[in-house]
Amino acid sequence: MRGILKVAAVCALMLGAVGAWAQDSGEAVYKLKCAMCHGADGTANTPAGKAFNAASYKDPAVMKTPDADLIAVVKNGKNKMPAFGTMLTDAQIKAVVAYVHTLQK
């Protein structure tokens, strides 16, 4: 329980970390907002990813999800994933979803 609280606290600190240089770069936003749970390579093989059962972007079933649905999950959250709709612009969210597709390869 204590470990999950530490992970949640670190995630909360990182939520405010997107710099101006990363505003429209899907890769940069992913690295700052998503990689902690989903991993730099998209496998979700991280302590936070395991704790929160994060989706792996190497899973073909996950990647068959329509972009509109992925965008909705990023904006509104789902299960243990927090909502980022108030922290990221629509352009940033779309850029992250586009970047996630590059991790599938």
Role assignments for model-derived ranges:
Residues 51-104:
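Extracytoplasmic electron-transfer domains, predominantly the class I c-type cytochrome c fold
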Residues 1-9:
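Bacterial N-terminal signal peptides that target proteins for export
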Residues 27-53, 78-80, 102-105:
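Periplasmic/extracellular electron-transfer cofactor-ligation site
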Residues 13-29, 45:
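Electrostatic cytochrome c docking/interface patches
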